[in-house]
Amino acid sequence: MSASTSSHRPIKGILKNKSSSGSSVATSGQQSGGNIQDVKRKKSQKWDESSILATHRATYRDYDLMKANEPGTSYMNLQDDGEDSVRDVEGEDSVRGVEGKEAMAATDASDHSCEVEEEESNEAYMRKLLLHKQEKKRQFEIRRRLHYNEELNIKLARQLMWNDLQSEDDENEERPQATNEEKTAAEESEEAPLSGGLQTQSCDP
């Protein structure tokens, strides 16, 4: 009985077999007509988490949009009271005539001076940025040299420590001979008062 049921089941694997998936859908469709629509609906409802995460746009991200840092443009403010105000402005321009042209020339000159100042400020900013980069590079090279010299410094420190230990060992070897002579002299000096003290004590009783 188990052999007959295992022969009807398709072999499950990672890759889909086109013939087995088609036959299983066909057999399930024959069993119930509504199941085909359910299967299609279920397939369409599958979510791909990686695509959701890739297309999800958080509100805090600005997506590196450029921000315009341009100076405001100069313009003439007109009132929207009607045609009379426009005629008044036109009339004033015709009356002023030369003054208006001079004002426009002055506005153009001020725009040009703003552009020159902006270019100068950009140049100053670029110079400052260049100096900052050069300073960072110089500091990096100094730190790198110090780092690479660290191995040599460690070797030198070990050599100095070895020399200090050797000199201390040499001093210790010389000291025991001197201390042995001092100890014998000190013992002799201590023995002399002790023997005299013993004699005085023996006389008293």
UniProtKB/Swiss-Prot annotation:
One GO MF term attached to the UniProt entry: protein phosphatase inhibitor activity
Composition bias, Basic and acidic residues: 84-102, 174-186
Skewed-composition ranges (Low complexity): 19-34
Xref: InterPro entries: PPI-2 (IPR007062)
Region feature Required for binding PPP1CC, mapped onto this chain: 12-17, 43-55
Record bears the keyword Disulfide bond: no
Keywords from the UniProt entry: Protein phosphatase inhibitor
Region annotation (Required for binding PPP1CC catalytic center, displacing metal ions and inhibition of PPP1CC catalytic activity) ranges: 147-150
Disordered as annotated region, ranges: 1-51, 70-114, 165-205
Top-level taxon of the source organism: Eukaryota
Record-level GO BP terms: regulation of signal transduction
Function: Functions as a protein phosphatase inhibitor. It inhibits activity of the catalytic subunit of PP1 and weakly inhibits the activity of myosin-associated phosphates.
Stated family: Belongs to the protein phosphatase inhibitor 2 family.
Protein name in the entry: Protein phosphatase inhibitor 2 family member C
